[in-house]
Amino acid sequence: MNFIIPYYCDERLKYTQKYLKKAGYNEVFDKSEANFAVFAPACDKEMFKGYENVHVFYGVGDYDKKYKNCYDYNKRDDFKYKNAILTSEGAIALYKENSNKAIYGSNILITGFGKIGKSLCNVLKAMGSKLTICARSDIDKAQAKTIADNVIDFKALQCQNYDIIFNTVPAIYFTKNEIDTFKNDIKYIELASFPGGIDKHYAKIKNIDIIDGSKLPSRYSKISAGYLIGETIDKMIKEGKNWKSDIAWQAHFVHLAKQ
């Protein structure tokens, strides 16, 4: 089966290519010869022009709802789980680059207990931190209590005791009242997508350093992240189910996988 990577705009794709070739796929450079195309996790809608007749695997956006030939590997739970592990490793590396203090013994707050929050919680607790989880649902709170030292609700968010905050929630909970209680040397690491979790304007007034934690897998684990994309695409093609509702297209991919 032939594939094309038309835009090597993301270093991860170099390793996606290596994974796919090792898995038995053949890279071509003419889209008319390709069975499928691979786009980077973040791609622009303009990239899809000219690929209407090629199956396209990509990673961010709802293009799969608009275009019948598009498939989002980032919507798979197995991809999101493994990518969260890479993100949590990157978050710790990012902290170490911006601080001379150990994680061991530090008072740490993680806001949010999704896949990234859970992965980060496991790693930070194993490193000996004093860990508080701020979670929303009763299920998340119950799970967090099995790992963290303390679990709080967003309504009870207090910040005066923390050395480090890892935010994973794309909603602004850290406003003037919370920021005014921050320690002077606090490290705030933003892992959430826009708009983030903090009032950036007021944080700047208070000289709070917001450490940008975007795109951590590509920044710290580009090889593993690239292999993960390739592994996920390979699984999707071989399964031909549970990732696209159109039965005819599922059957077509099963046929391709057997070629």
Predicted regions and their residues:
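Residues in the short beta-alpha loop(s) of Rossmann-like NAD(P)-binding domains
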Residues: 9, 136-137, 192-194
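Glycine-rich adenosine-cofactor-binding loop
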Residues: 4-14, 20, 104-124
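C-terminal helix-to-coil terminal segments
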Residues: 79, 211-259
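Glycine/serine-rich phosphate-binding loop and adjoining beta1-alpha1 elements at the start
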Residues: 39-50, 54-105, 213, 232, ...
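A short, well-structured beta->alpha microelement
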Residues: 20-34, 44-47, 153-155
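Residues at the starts of beta-strands that form the adenosine-phosphate
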Residues: 2, 26, 33, 107, ...
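NAD(P)-binding Rossmann-fold cofactor-contacting core
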Residues: 30, 127-147
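Rossmann-like adenosine-cofactor binding region
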Residues: 42-53, 144-219
